[in-house]
């Protein structure tokens, strides 16, 4: 929960229950970045540090409404085993590990891992705050394109509502 607290404003942080539900419903879609992956040091199980995560769920298809994009939504209502759309519900890296390419490399590695296991995927979806330029850069560099905007999707610590951009990447898989 330390990563969530250091990465997101209070009003859009997800609580422990949401993370536990994600782990229970789709454990293959919850991937962590350990300091071992960055420096060759011992991993979390040997005293290393968990410094990032990516949470996801499978959807039957790209949604036709905004409701599934809400913070803290019930994954058990949205998740569809064998679904063709991967929704990246949360992605974060501790601030001290940002700025040197770690986030982008981890994001790509996490998606590669999920894609390898989930052969039915045809698209990947996420929502990002319009003002989170570093995150948008990572997503754009990985082939995600803006689809539409959700007005007032994110609330800052200053109680200012900011728009979210839903982005999608179509997978072109070899048969």
List where the protein language model places each region.
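Conserved GNAT acetyl-CoA-binding A-motif
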Residues: 107, 114-130
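Conserved acetyl-CoA-binding loop of GNAT-fold acetyltransferases
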Residues: 140-149
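Conserved acetyl-CoA-binding loop-helix of GNAT-fold acetyltransferases
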Residues: 93, 99-114, 137, 141
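Short hydrophobic/aromatic beta-strand element in the GNAT-like acyltransferase core
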Residues: 28-32, 53, 90, 125, ...
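Alpha-helical elements of Rossmann-like donor-binding domains used by nucleotide-donor carbohydrate transfer enzymes
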Residues: 2-3, 18, 105, 109, ...
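Conserved beta-strand-loop-alpha-helix junction that forms the acyl-donor binding cleft
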Residues: 95-98, 124-136, 152-162
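Conserved acyl-donor/pantetheine-binding loop and adjacent beta-alpha core of acyl/acetyltransferases
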Residues: 46-47, 55-90, 153-159
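Active-site rim helix/loop that mediates acceptor-substrate recognition in acyltransferases
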Residues: 9-43, 51, 55-61, 73-77
């Amino acid at each position: 929960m330390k990563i969530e607290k250091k990465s997101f404003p209070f009003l859009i942080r997800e609580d422990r229950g949401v993370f536990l539900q994600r782990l229970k419903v789709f454990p293959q879609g919850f991937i962590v970045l350990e300091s071992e992956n960055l420096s060759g040091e011992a991993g979390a199980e040997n005293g290393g540090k968990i410094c990032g995560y990516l949470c996801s769920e499978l959807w039957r298809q790209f949604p036709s409404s905004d409701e599934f994009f809400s913070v803290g939504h019930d994954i058990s209502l949205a998740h569809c085993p064998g679904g063709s759309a991967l929704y990246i519900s949360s992605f974060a890296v501790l601030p001290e590990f940002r700025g040197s390419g770690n986030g982008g490399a981890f994001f790509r590695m996490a998606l590669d891992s999920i894609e390898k296991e989930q052969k039915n995927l045809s698209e990947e979806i996420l929502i990002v705050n319009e003002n989170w330029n570093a995150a948008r850069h990572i997503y754009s560099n990985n082939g995600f394109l803006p689809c539409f905007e959700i007005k007032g999707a994110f609330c800052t610590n200053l109680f200012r509502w900011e728009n979210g951009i839903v982005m999608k990447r179509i997978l072109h898989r070899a048969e």
